[in-house]
């Protein structure tokens, strides 16, 4: 695995449950097309798995 993981919000969280919206906020994804780079940890991977239908993941 790489040291960091980059992901982008490509679909809006509007209409999603409160848990999904809280996960997006926890990942730092507040606006559409916002790109965030984080350390690649199991916790971040789990959060991304929960919102995988809303984000694009670039492992670099």
UniProtKB/Swiss-Prot annotation:
Alphabetically ordered keywords of this record: Ribonucleoprotein, Ribosomal protein
BP terms from Gene Ontology: translation
Domain of life: Bacteria
Coiled-coil zones: none
Alphabetical list of InterPro entries matching this protein: Ribo_uL30_ferredoxin-like_sf, Ribosomal_uL30_bac-type, Ribosomal_uL30_ferredoxin-like
GO cellular component: cytosolic large ribosomal subunit
CDD domains: Ribosomal_L30
GO MF assignments: structural constituent of ribosome
Record note on quaternary structure: Part of the 50S ribosomal subunit.
Entry-linked NCBIfam families: rpmD_bact
Protein family per UniProt: Belongs to the universal ribosomal protein uL30 family.
Descriptive protein name: Large ribosomal subunit protein uL30
Protein species of origin: Desulfotalea psychrophila (strain LSv54 / DSM 12343)
